[in-house]
């Protein structure tokens, strides 16, 4: 997993998304990280800090080459982004989220026929603070990280995702 052609997309770079992105940047500095966030200050900071390499502006095109896409926005927004990602992510992409509740996103994944790509996730971390400025490259380190793969996602994808999380 040290391939410099490896690309990871993030939709939402708040406390959790920002922390995961910062951790991946620290461990895998050669990976390409693409970020999208509704807050222009957040996305500007992530780019200026070298956490992301480019800013995504369109879910339908900007995540097409990603090996992973992390949905790190609030749950109701993550569900909305799925429609845009359907048909645009590549066949090898692993799609995941970090939301604390799973029923709504799993139902939408099933409805859209995206089950072979999706592994739900939730790192058991948090802070009384919120936002990218409070994210840390070590926030999710050594934390419990629950995963909820669909029944149709392959064992290899689950194994690959667990490997990324362990690093």
Which residue stretches match the model-derived regions?
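Hydrophobic/aromatic beta-strand patches that form the interior of the parallel beta-sheet core
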Residues: 34-36, 56, 96, 119, ...
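Rossmann-like NAD(P)-binding element
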Residues: 60-89, 93-94
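Glycine-rich, N-terminal phosphate-binding loop of Rossmann-like dinucleotide-binding domains
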Residues: 72-74, 99, 149
């Amino acid at each position: 997993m040290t391939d410099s052609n490896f690309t990871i997309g993030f939709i939402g770079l708040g406390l959790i998304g920002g922390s995961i992105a910062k951790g991946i940047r620290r461990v895998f500095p050669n990976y390409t990280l693409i970020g999208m966030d509704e807050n222009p200050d957040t996305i500007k900071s992530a780019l200026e800090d070298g956490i992301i390499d480019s800013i995504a502006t369109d879910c339908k095109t900007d995540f097409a080459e990603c090996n992973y896409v992390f949905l790190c926005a609030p749950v109701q927004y993550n569900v909305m982004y799925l429609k845009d990602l359907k048909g645009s992510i590549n066949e090898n992409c692993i799609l995941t989220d970090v939301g604390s509740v799973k029923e709504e996103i799993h139902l939408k994944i099933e409805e859209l026929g995206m089950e072979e790509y999706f592994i739900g996730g939730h790192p058991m971390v948090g802070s009384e603070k919120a936002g990218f400025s409070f994210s840390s490259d070590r926030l999710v380190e050594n934390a419990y990280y629950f995963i909820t793969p669909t029944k149709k996602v392959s064992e290899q994808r689950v194994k690959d995702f667990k490997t990324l999380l362990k690093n």
